[in-house]
Amino acid sequence: MYYEKAVQKTINWIESHLHEQISNEDIVNVSSFSKFHFHRIFQKEVGMSVASYIRLRRLANAAAALLYTDHRIIDIALYYQFESQEAFTRTFKKMYHMPPGAYRTFMKRFTSKKEESYMEKKMKGWVLSGSHPFQFEMGIDRENVHQGKASGYLKSTMVQDIGEFATMMQQFKADRYLGKRLRLSSFIKTKGVQHFASLWMRVDSAADDVLQFDNMSNRPITGTTNWNHYAIVLDVPENSAVISFGVQLSGPGQVWMDHVVFEEVDESVPSTNLEMPGELLDEPVNLSFEEELQK
């Protein structure tokens, strides 16, 4: 958890300085770790190097600028710290498989047609659930993207109370992960979240008993936040049947998620399981409310 906070602090700083030069000394100062130690931590937590992360985020922002602004390609390239339009084009083409100019033309046509149909189609694999799902909306966003070409979002539409919540979620069989420790991670961004937003995961038995659960209730995301990295780590007991996961929004606001990753980890990675009530007692106790007074 200590390393997670250091990584989140550094990512938050990076997100605010993508249009500026970022040196190794900057990362050292923000993270408060030595260069090589923090780079190992970052690689382990996020799954890529600091340099790769910065390059990926600059490219994602540049791709959004190509679609949603009329700025010249050279201006976008220089704003995101590429040495030249040629250098930007080479790097962009490796990620998006076409040069920036062609991407701008193709994706604007593609997006305008797609947005019309997305309002009528469900998102593949994802379902909207919760206490008041009809007061929320989920969908695909091509402008607010962490990496690649799209992110998923969940936002309130008619929420009246902070206790009303919804989740954009999936479920799958636990068979493949029985007896293992599983780490779920995602990049999340929020806007105007009045109560809380969170990543969550639950492991259930065939009898629908909750075996493992974490909804980040002890570390909620609130307010307006930039893209950052969040993770949940749970064990999958041998009697597990179903794994559920998603992003949750309680009360008014909007939350985005992108680059969701599942991976097996060893026991050196701490579990984030929230302690559930223990085993049931054989009989009721302290019915007179006086047992504590007798000690």
Curated annotation (Swiss-Prot):
<dbReference type="Pfam" id="PF12833">
    <property type="entry name" value="HTH_18"/>
</dbReference>
<dbReference type="InterPro" id="IPR009057">
    <property type="entry name" value="Homeodomain-like_sf"/>
</dbReference>
<keyword id="KW-0805">Transcription regulation</keyword>
<dbReference type="GO" id="GO:0043565">
    <property type="term" value="F:sequence-specific DNA binding"/>
</dbReference>
<dbReference type="GO" id="GO:0005829">
    <property type="term" value="C:cytosol"/>
</dbReference>
<feature type="DNA-binding region" description="H-T-H motif">
    <location>
        <begin position="25"/>
        <end position="46"/>
    </location>
</feature>
<keyword id="KW-0238">DNA-binding</keyword>
<protein>
    <recommendedName>
        <fullName>Uncharacterized HTH-type transcriptional regulator YbfP</fullName>
    </recommendedName>
</protein>
<dbReference type="GO" id="GO:0001108">
    <property type="term" value="F:bacterial-type RNA polymerase holo enzyme binding"/>
</dbReference>
<dbReference type="GO" id="GO:0006355">
    <property type="term" value="P:regulation of DNA-templated transcription"/>
</dbReference>
<feature type="domain" description="HTH araC/xylS-type">
    <location>
        <begin position="8"/>
        <end position="106"/>
    </location>
</feature>
<comment type="function">
    <text>Probable transcriptional regulator.</text>
</comment>
<keyword id="KW-0804">Transcription</keyword>
<dbReference type="InterPro" id="IPR018060">
    <property type="entry name" value="HTH_AraC"/>
</dbReference>
<dbReference type="GO" id="GO:0003700">
    <property type="term" value="F:DNA-binding transcription factor activity"/>
</dbReference>
<dbReference type="InterPro" id="IPR050959">
    <property type="entry name" value="MarA-like"/>
</dbReference>
